[in-house]
Amino acid sequence: TGANTKSNSEGRVFGRESQLYVQGGFGKLGFGRFGTLSSGAGSYQILTGWAIGTGFGLSSWTSKIGTSFSRVDNGVAYQTPSFNGLQLSAMYSNGTKGDDEKWSKNNHYYGIGAKYEANAIKSSLIFEAVDNKDTAGTEKKKTQYAINFGFEYNLGTVTPMFAYQWAHQDEGKKTNMFGLSAKVAVGGGDALVGARYLFGDDDAPTATDDKVRSWNIGAAYIYPLSKRTALKAYAGYADSSKAWKETEDVVYNGYQLYVGMRHSF
């Protein structure tokens, strides 16, 4: 389920997640629309290793400097039961943004991953690909590949984290992204801090230099007022160089400040 908003639902009712599923001793099998394995959203996401998550602007692990796959339509997802802390996941989409064309002309998403959670350790490894078959002519794009790895170790008050992404697309981005972050219990809430660095190539810009560099830092604070309501504040700064130096987008070059309240229904 989910609200019908432009930012998350693409103008449709229940655009965040809408699925039919069966669950039992064999695991969980679902069909419908949901977030991908690395999306940070929905019932099947298993992303770990980045304290600031995917909901704080330029500090989001899924921001535009990296490679991410958000939500998919026509999806099939399966998650195994947990075996001593290890859970395996697989996901496929027959059409990431609809199913209006025949199979060979739809975008297809493929994802497989593993998550381990036991005692103080939480970690995940995810491989994903989108074949971009629904693009044509001069706009035709090559298959995108991404691998995400995350590791967290809970020390009690402080949970340090490490995240890494490898991404590759012919005639697109070929990048490595690293993130160091931490979650700290402070004043009845949680402080989230993180820094990222990305380097690689991007064939998309028109500039002659296809090398790219980007880094950002961010900090957020979440204070719960109740089980469903929390106050949130965030500040972040981003800077890029090489082919992205003049990119006029806050995710690449700029800063953000947020203050607000979240309520879950």
Question: Where are each of the predicted segments found?
Answer:
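Outer-membrane beta-barrel pore domains and translocons
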Residues: T1, F34-T36, M91-G95, E117, ...
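Outer membrane beta-barrel
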Residues: T1-G95, N106-H108, K115-K122
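Outer-membrane beta-barrel domain signature
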Residues: N4-E10, T62-F69, T96-K105, D131-K140, ...
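Short coil turns and loop connectors of transmembrane beta-barrels in diderm outer membranes
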Residues: G25-F26, N84-G85, N119-A120, G156-T157, ...
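Extracellular/periplasm-exposed beta-strand and loop segments of Gram-negative cell-envelope proteins
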Residues: I46-G66, K140-K142, Q169, Y197-D201, ...
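Detector for outer-membrane/organellar transmembrane beta-barrel domains
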Residues: K105-A220
